[in-house]
Amino acid sequence: LMLRPIETPTREIKKLDGLWAFSLDRENCGIDQRWWESALQESRAIAVPGSFNDQFADADIRNYAGNVWYQREVFIPKGWAGQRIVLRFDAVTHYGKVWVNNQEVMEHQGGYTPFEADVTPYVIAGKSVRITVCVNNELNWQTIPPGMVITDENGKKKQSYFHDFFNYAGIHRSVMLYTTPNTWVDDITVVTHVAQDCNHASVDWQVVANGDVSVEL
């Protein structure tokens, strides 16, 4: 379980929800042509979070199968200098690969779980940074839900379903940057045990931290 960050005296959050640039990769050439290295060509504005399928009055976009690209320029607050900076996506359906400027920082398979990466080495406080995301919505036997992609008589990819709902896709939940101190708690595990007579109980706990920390229970 990955807990959602909240603002605290030692953690600031910058939401990246809003309008992003969006492009279809109809020829599946974006990776080979390294689209993340410059502004997306022939892009249009799209709302994040949200399904790309329902944001345009175009059946070809609604039923599109393959890679799509999102991009946004983001300003890193000058006050974040000296802090650890993390880029987090709450959900990307069904596969996402992320670049910060020209650096690939993470990829994730699974459209319903969050993922994040420490991007401190790739950003400079007080300057802007380009975030690019390649999203793939194709279903296969390993995705949830499963499915397959077929090619119609016109050579166009088409989703084949084994379930009773539409394959909505895109950056489906919030995107954010957040800070932590350079010494931070990375994970907390708490396991409780209750005796059958309910008269005794014990608690096992484990804290994983980066750096030397003291923990008060």
Question: Where do the model's predicted regions map?
Answer:
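Beta-strand-rich binding/interaction modules
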Residues: V100, N199-L217
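Short, Gly/Pro- and small/polar-rich lid/capping loops
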Residues: L1-P5
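Short, solvent-exposed loop/linker segments at the N-terminal edge
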Residues: T192-H200
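Accessory beta-strand-rich segments of carbohydrate-active enzymes
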Residues: I6-E7, E12, A21-E27, D60-D187, ...
